[in-house]
Amino acid sequence: DFFRYLNYKIEWKDSLIGIKGPKGCGKTTMLLQHIKETFLGNDLDKVLYISLDNLYFASHDILDVVEAHYNNGGTHIFIDEIHYYEKWQTLLKNISDDFPGLNIVYTGSSMLQIQAGEGDLSRRQAMYEMRGLSFREFLQFEQGIKQDAVELEDLLHNHIGIAMNICSQTAILPLFKRYLKYGYYPFYKDVHNGIDIRLQAVVNQIIENDYAKIDDVNISTIRKTKKMLMVLSERVPQQPNMSSLYRELETDRNQGLKMLYALQRGGLLLLLGDNVKSSDNLSRPDKIYVNNPTLMYALSPYAEIGTVRETFFFNQLSEAHECRYPKA
């Protein structure tokens, strides 16, 4: 079976675990795999998996469900789509306080909402972030080729040997082209040729649902944010003329930067600047990218291959490194 990289990094014995990341990156699948591998058999009655996007919780109190599970010997609870619960942070505190010994794992599809409230839980929880498939994971997912993660230092000094080792196992270039086109999101195997439509639905949900909830933005801002994403997707990577962009969107600098960084936190854009902490101050980025090549192709089917490769490199490197834009 194929397991995501994050599955092996999580300390599953911790009492409170949060997993955040963009919609479609595979968080739910990872939870269900862990439950199957860990509890299948005599211990299955000790674990409860619930998803808060289920309509059941529109008229039922989740704390009643947790209490019933706990009183019947439950030791673990997995809460998916936590951001659908309006006061999710209070909910997690109450569960943690009221049910001692209960192990809690929760996920949120929107990085926006998880980030907005994680400060008060920071002392209690272990927080992890999941991203889309790396090319290394894609090779294993697609053809069963297992390759250890390559450190940047090793890549810089031994790239020829690393490349020869991988190329000896398969014809790598056709696979790389397929990865760039549709391989970043694990659900590509389920949708076949409909990945563009699926990704457009993901984008709409992030902007219309997640962004609207966290910042309580109105319909006009949602429309402008969608337009911003589409305008930028046709021009990236670029050193943006933000004043011109704001005029085109009929917005001001303050709102424009809020929309821009919301798109970044939602996993739709990558922003590159000379200061890695610039997002705290909402400063103008030096360069803007669509988050990953697969999303780039979905938003702009005729993306230039050099731009696609540059986006791939930035996306992969930023997983474990701070990327900065060099100043002259």
Language-model segments: residues:
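Pre-Walker A adenine-sensing motif
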Residues: 1-12
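Hydrophobic anchor at the beta1->P-loop junction of P-loop NTPases
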Residues: 19
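Walker A (P-loop) phosphate-binding loop of P-loop NTPases
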Residues: 23-24
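Conserved lysine of the Walker
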Residues: 27-28
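Short glycine-rich substrate-engagement loop in P-loop NTPases that contacts/grips substrate
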Residues: 44-73
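Structural recognition of the conserved hydrophobic beta-strand(s) that form the central parallel beta-sheet
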Residues: 78, 103-109, 129
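Interdomain motor-coupling "hinge/lid" segment immediately C-terminal to the ATP-binding subdomain
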Residues: 117-229, 233
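Accessory nucleic acid-recognition modules appended to NTPase machines
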Residues: 189-328
